[in-house]
Design a protein with these regions (language model features):
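A short, Lys/Arg-rich alpha-helix, primarily the initiator
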Residues: 29-72
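Recognition helix of helix-turn-helix/homeodomain-like DNA-binding domains
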Residues: 84-99, 107-109
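Short amphipathic recognition helices of helix-turn-helix/homeodomain-type DNA-binding modules
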Residues: 103-106, 110-142
């Protein structure tokens, strides 16, 4: 592969990165149309779809509250104690013998740590209007939040970062992500681009992931934790889809040292034209959102897990800047 040929050249990681710039540029240009979609996502205003509509449901507010209580593995006695109400009253609410006030619905939802979208569903089931708005990211009232996300993404360069919605659909990226996706099928890079599908799909970057088995285990476990918290059926379907993907041809069997128990974090080790790059990721969310869209937005930032990865990405960025300066000089 091109990554192996580049990695075999003499010199330090930074030197190898500079030597590979022309090769990388050529490979990326071959997929300009597909990658332009990813690069274009660094504008949040057009990346988010319109607010979703609620489907009618016959479940009562008591049914929903009981489901959330059981999902949180709380007994009626424990929830009643934390909510400072009687167990009898909670039992009446769950059975439908008592209709909770708007304040009581919100009080119980807070104790159960129910997501904002589901809190709206609880209110509607109880006969009240939704409390939390769901605006598209293009809404002028979210301009400050948009700017904050764009600043975080841009400020993370030369390392890759992306913003995703609750279903892991990419809504924005920085410019460092595109070159890492040059091996993905253009069909998978058409909006909406799902980050998890892109990483594990046979036509995505799965064949480029060196530690595919460990990464797959990490992705599925993380997705399951989200499902346990949110009860999101779309995430459940996504998990089943990802779990059914075949092992990429040539994938190496997991090594004992790759066990998550032996690491501080599960890295993403990616085979690229620069050689094997290794990343660990962090997740950033809004601290006190009162908008459904913002409450479901997360930024995944990838950091270099070794000095070679850091040097390679810095070298690539330096050469891009140099090419830009030369191009501007030639145009004058």
């Amino acid at each position: 592969m091109a990554g192996n040929r580049c990695a075999a050249r003499p010199g330090g990681p930074g030197v190898r990165a500079r030597q590979c710039v022309e090769r990388i540029t050529s490979q990326v240009m071959d997929r300009r149309g597909a990658l332009a979609i990813i690069v274009g996502m660094n504008t949040l205003s057009s990346a988010q779809s319109a607010p979703s509509t609620r489907s009618a449901t016959s479940r009562t507010v008591g049914d929903l509250l009981r489901e959330w209580r059981q999902r949180r593995r709380m007994s009626q006695l424990l929830l009643a104690a934390e909510a400072d109400i009687s167990t009898r009253h909670l039992s009446f609410v769950e059975s439908g013998r008592a209709m909770p006030s708007r304040e009581m619905v919100m009080h119980l939802a807070e104790r159960l740590d129910v997501p904002l979208r589901a809190r709206n569903a609880l209110l509607v089931a109880a006969g009240y209007a939704p409390l939390f708005r769901e605006r598209p990211l293009s809404d002028p009232q979210l301009s400050a939040a948009r700017e904050a996300v764009e600043l975080v993404l841009k400020g993370h360069e030369p390392y890759p970062a992306l913003a995703v919605d609750r279903h892991w659909n990419i809504v924005a990226t920085n410019n460092a992500l595109g070159p890492l996706l040059s091996g993905a099928s253009p069909d998978l890079l058409k909006p909406p681009v799902n980050a998890l599908r892109l990483s594990l799909h046979p036509e995505g970057i799965a064949s480029s992931i060196v530690n595919w088995h460990a990464w797959r285990e990490h992705v599925l476990a993380r997705l399951q934790r989200q499902i346990d918290v949110s009860a999101d059926q779309t995430l459940s379907a996504l998990r089943d889809e990802l779990a059914a993907y075949p092992t990429p041809p040539g994938a190496q069997p997991p090594e004992p040292g790759e066990s998550p128990l032996n690491q501080i974090a599960v890295p993403l080790r990616l085979r690229t034209p620069l050689g094997v790059l290794s990343f660990f990721s962090t997740t950033t969310v809004f601290g006190t959102p009162v908008d459904v869209t913002l409450s479901e937005l997360a930024i995944e930032a990838f950091f270099p897990a070794d000095p070679q990865t850091a040097a390679a990405l810095h070298g690539l960025t330096d050469n891009r800047r140099s090419d830009g300066v030369h191009g501007a000089t030639a145009g004058t």
